[in-house]
From Swiss-Prot:
The gene is Nap1l4. Acts as a histone chaperone in nucleosome assembly. In condensing spermatids, mediates the loading of the heterodimer composed of histones H2AB1 and H2BC1/TH2B onto the nucleosomes, thereby promoting the replacement of histones to protamine in male germ cells. Keywords: Acetylation, Chaperone, Cytoplasm, Nucleus, Phosphoprotein. It comes from Mus musculus (Mouse). InterPro entries: NAP-like_sf (IPR037231), NAP_family (IPR002164). It comes from the Eukaryota. Interacts with core (H2A, H2B, H3, H4) and linker (H1) histones. This is Nucleosome assembly protein 1-like 4. One of its GO terms (cellular component) is cytoplasm.
Amino acid sequence: MAENSLSDGGPADSVEAAKNASNTEKLTDQVMQNPQVLAALQERLDNVSHTPSSYIETLPKAVKRRINALKQLQVRCAHIEAKFYEEVHDLERKYAALYQPLFDKRREFITGDVEPTDAESAWHSENEEEDKLAGDMKNKVVIAEKEAATVEELNPKGIPEFWFTIFRNVDMLSELVQEYDEPILKHLQDIKVKFSDPGQPMSFVLEFHFEPNDYFTNPVLTKTYKMKSEPDKADPFSFEGPEIVDCDGCTIDWKKGKNVTVKTIKKKQKHKGRGTVRTITKQVPNESFFNFFSPLKASGDGESLDEDSEFTLASDFEIGHFFRERIVPRAVLYFTGEAIEDDDNFEEGEEGEEEELEGDEEGEDEDDADVNPKV
């Protein structure tokens, strides 16, 4: 009977089980008192609690189903937003027609085809007293110069080198301009923005109008930027409005020997058999602003661009957008430098705000270490 009771899980087994449980509890206590183990466990818990995807995985199936329904709504919102931007593009086209007469008059003043009236040229500066003082000093200098040399004051036609000065003032553009580009850009008379016609795919064209010159025969050079305003089927939640997706340039009809986008190099070749040497000339690409009109093409055949090409294309898109949104509408302010000062002040404000926010975050970490604003 005793043997049967032991084999059936009698008192001896109970004692052994109790002993094992006690040992396990002691081992657990020892492990939980180890700082390294506790730190590792805490880090793991923190990572789980602060990762949104990990949190979503813990939710019941019914809740996940409702979240999927919210995503469906979000996609529909993205399509409505795309429609909104299409109508904004239509409004831009409408108001571009209202701006154009003013821009045409701007061109006439710049080129000197029309002289502004006294009423049109009247301007009251915010620093009127300083301007008056500067004007008085200037008048004294002019009078002194006239008395000394009796030279008639020059009165150039229009506003010389208006657009070229803008290129020099704006860093984004001046970085593209080489010394041999400068004489050509001095012939630039106007830059216009044209929007795509109603019902056509969204796009805009930059038109660079040149006076007759010794470099090329084109009166106008164009750059077309193609846009897309619809959510990506593969990633609809990334939609943030219209984006430039491709661009086309134009062919520049260079006059003989005037093409600044290529340079000619001479190379000597030696004949293997006869040992005679001949000199050959070869044209190779040359850095120039006018390469702007021969852009890279965005890959549309499934092949991806290399990193350098992607960067070049993105920079091109940024420049085109800057011409459209900033340079053309506010040209005179980039000529005088006032718009550049505004841009610089805005950038400094953003940096200061970022530094201040970083300081606030550090303070929050000290006061409440459990708070994570990203959760």
